[in-house]
């Protein structure tokens, strides 16, 4: 897909930042307008992250205009907002391939461009990495500058504050830009504050500030008086800030959509010494009314018609696994006031919107704080409640120590509803749920369940909720299979079920690839087993299958290394059972973006791939 660049004459002159910096400053507002329209036209045709990019158009233009990228390091946190950055850094013609197999990466990616200095995808990493780059730049001694852009959501994470605390302590030269899009631009974030920001970042104020500190450094009472006077003066017109206490020079808030003022403020700040924080106010979805009105709904979008202002409705009546979880949550909470649901800022994605509205006293969104979420749940369990942590597989990685130290060691009854297990599709390497079975399986006391359809998912959530110890139910992104939902009942822990009796080959399936495995079992007259539990493994059943079949095939949408199949291998070795075993799953490399079905086919995890691998093994 290629757009007619002739419709965007100013943008056509800015193929890369070098060309951008040659434009007169007066042309920047026009460039921003065209960039925003280009982004709208592109994403509406290709799908992708949308509202975040619209909100940082002016900031992106100003940063590349003022800073000498890629010599200067520009670090984007998370990266949802980096589409304008990609368009301005030589990837304009490829932006229509973003998030597609073999296309542009959905986030900044080091292997894709020299302008992407940090590969990202998870939140709150930018300041830590940026500080490391700033220290390296200081030792290099060539005047390289470091800028980190972080949102008001991502900055709530502990890692961001840990990094700021360290930056303030070692006083390295770096700029952190806080992109605050929680509210629309208010009147006090207008001319006065823009003028104040330029004044506070200007050379005269800075030299007086630093010179005065040096001159009176030996006289504590006078130094303290100056500091109090400075804070009082700033406090009249800008928010009081935690950032100054962390050692940052705070400037702002300023209008993040005034590209001229933003450019001047950044020019003033470029030469400042020590850690600086610029607080800008932006509107997520800026320039496209439907996205401004509903920035969450327009955060990541399918292909749509810009003229209609609406997103296409999903087809079919089969619910997603996230919806199945949310409905089960409400059903259970209606009967049990001890239920407490915890999520680290993933209410919409985890299917918890209805629950949060109907049971607000039992719902906790702890923000982007996965470590806190898990230990908070441990505390709830100690207090006699029944906590459920709803979390994506990829984000549970961030709370691994808490899972072990605060939940499993104490054998606390915390249920983990792990969404996005396995291949997730367009978000690529940083978001694949490829490792959870591997990193949980080695933890004592854990019960790990892998449903094969939405009915089993409900039954396993019910079972895990009533289990007296830590339990995890791991389910994929996307729709169920259309299975009939049965009344809830507790399942026997650690027991699989034989779905089909066959000969010679037994296929042991962990999770929702069962439907694909069923086709293969029918074609090969193989035994098919829905294993259900990764831990505790149904050892009795596995040993029976090993004794009655020539080949065992394990199938899972998880890394082969350390996964469910490895558990089968370990059991057979421990019992000295000599039987041929083929482990099928995800390979030992990070899986890039692509549609889920595309990637399953590539890794031989669709029906045709499973069958061909088994047939090759039997030769």
Swiss-Prot record:
GO terms for biological process: 1-deoxy-D-xylulose 5-phosphate biosynthetic process; isopentenyl diphosphate biosynthetic process, methylerythritol 4-phosphate pathway; terpenoid biosynthetic process; thiamine biosynthetic process. CDD domains: TPP_DXS, TPP_PYR_DXS_TK_like. It comes from the Bacteria. This is 1-deoxy-D-xylulose-5-phosphate synthase. The keyword Magnesium applies. It is an enzyme of class 2 (transferase). Its EC number is 2.2.1.7. Mg(2+) binds at residues 152, 181. Binds 1 Mg(2+) ion per subunit. Its cofactor is Mg(2+); thiamine diphosphate. InterPro entries: Dxylulose-5-P_synthase, THDP-binding, Transketo_C/PFOR_II, Transketolase-like_Pyr-bd, Transketolase_BS, Transketolase_C. Gene3D superfamilies: 3.40.50.920, 3.40.50.970. The keyword Magnesium applies. Belongs to the transketolase family. DXPS subfamily. Thiamine diphosphate binds at residues 80, 121-123, 153-154, 181, 288, 370. GO terms for molecular function: 1-deoxy-D-xylulose-5-phosphate synthase activity; magnesium ion binding; thiamine pyrophosphate binding. Pathway: Metabolic intermediate biosynthesis; 1-deoxy-D-xylulose 5-phosphate biosynthesis; 1-deoxy-D-xylulose 5-phosphate from D-glyceraldehyde 3-phosphate and pyruvate: step 1/1. Keywords: Isoprene biosynthesis, Magnesium, Metal-binding, Thiamine biosynthesis, Thiamine pyrophosphate, Transferase. GO terms for cellular component: cytosol. Homodimer. Catalyzes the acyloin condensation reaction between C atoms 2 and 3 of pyruvate and glyceraldehyde 3-phosphate to yield 1-deoxy-D-xylulose-5-phosphate (DXP). It catalyses: D-glyceraldehyde 3-phosphate + pyruvate + H(+) = 1-deoxy-D-xylulose 5-phosphate + CO2.
């Amino acid at each position: 897909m290629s757009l007619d660049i002739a419709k965007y004459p100013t943008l056509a002159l800015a193929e890369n930042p070098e060309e951008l910096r040659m434009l007169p400053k007066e042309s920047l507002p026009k460039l921003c307008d065209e960039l925003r329209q280009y982004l709208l036209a592109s994403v509406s045709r290709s799908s992708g992250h949308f509202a975040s990019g619209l909100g940082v158009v002016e900031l992106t233009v100003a940063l590349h205009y003022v800073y000498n990228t890629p010599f200067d390091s520009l670090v984007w946190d998370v990266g949802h907002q980096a589409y304008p950055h990609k368009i301005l850094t030589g990837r304009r013609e490829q932006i229509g391939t973003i998030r597609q197999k073999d296309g542009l990466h959905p986030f900044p990616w080091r292997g894709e461009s020299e302008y992407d200095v940090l590969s990202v995808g998870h939140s709150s990493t930018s300041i830590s990495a940026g500080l490391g780059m700033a220290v390296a730049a200081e030792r290099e001694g060539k005047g390289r500058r470091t800028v980190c852009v972080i949102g008001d959501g991502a900055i709530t994470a502990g890692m961001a504050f840990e990094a700021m605390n360290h930056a303030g302590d070692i006083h390295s030269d770096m700029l952190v830009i806080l992109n605050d899009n929680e509210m629309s631009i208010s009147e006090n974030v207008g001319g006065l504050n823009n003028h104040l920001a330029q004044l506070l970042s200007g050379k005269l104020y800075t030299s007086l500030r630093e010179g005065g500190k040096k001159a009176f450094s030996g006289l504590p009472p006078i130094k303290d008086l100056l500091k109090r006077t400075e804070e009082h003066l700033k406090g009249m017109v800008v928010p009081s800030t935690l950032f100054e206490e962390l050692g940052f020079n705070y400037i702002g808030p300023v209008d993040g959509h005034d590209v001229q003022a933003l450019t001047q403020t950044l020019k003033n700040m470029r030469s400042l010494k020590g850690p600086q924080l610029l607080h800008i106010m932006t509107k997520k979805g800026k320039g496209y009314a439907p996205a401004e009105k509903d920035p969450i709904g327009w955060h990541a979008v399918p292909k749509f018609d810009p003229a209609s202002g609406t997103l296409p409705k999903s087809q079919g009546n089969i619910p997603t696994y996230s919806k199945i979880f949310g409905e089960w949550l409400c059903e259970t909470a209606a009967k049990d006031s001890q239920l407490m649901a915890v999520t680290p800022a993933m209410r919409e994605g985890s299917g918890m919107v209805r629950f949060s509205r109907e049971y607000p006293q039992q719902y906790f969104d702890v923000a982007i704080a996965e470590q806190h979420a898990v230990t908070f749940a441990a505390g709830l369990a100690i207090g006699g409640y029944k906590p459920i942590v709803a979390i994506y597989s990829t984000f549970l990685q961030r709370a691994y120590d808490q899972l072990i130290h605060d939940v499993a060691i104490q054998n606390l009854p915390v249920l983990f509803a792990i969404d996005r297990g396995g291949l997730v599709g367009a978000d690529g390497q940083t978001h694949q749920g490829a490792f959870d079975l591997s990193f949980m399986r080695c933890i004592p006391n854990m019960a790990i369940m892998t449903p094969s359809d939405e009915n089993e998912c409900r039954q396993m959530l019910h079972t895990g909720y009533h289990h007296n110890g830590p339990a995890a139910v791991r389910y994929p992104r996307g729709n169920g299979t259309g299975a009939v939902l049965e009344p809830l009942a507790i399942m026997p822990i650690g027991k699989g079920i034989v779905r089909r009796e066959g000969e010679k080959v037994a296929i042991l399936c962990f999770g929702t690839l069962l439907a694909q495995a069923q086709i293969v079992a029918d074609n090969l007259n193989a035994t098919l087993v829905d294993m259900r539990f990764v831990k505790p493994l149904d050892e009795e059943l596995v040993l029976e299958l090993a004794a009655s079949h020539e080949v065992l095939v394990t199938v899972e949408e998880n890394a082969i290394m350390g996964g469910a199949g490895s558990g089968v291998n370990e059991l057979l070795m421990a019992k000295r059972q000599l039987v041929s075993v083929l482990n099928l799953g995800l390979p030992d490399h990070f899986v890039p973006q692509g549609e889920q079905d595309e990637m399953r086919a590539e890794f031989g995890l669709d029906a045709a791939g499973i069958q061909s691998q088994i047939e090759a093994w039997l030769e």
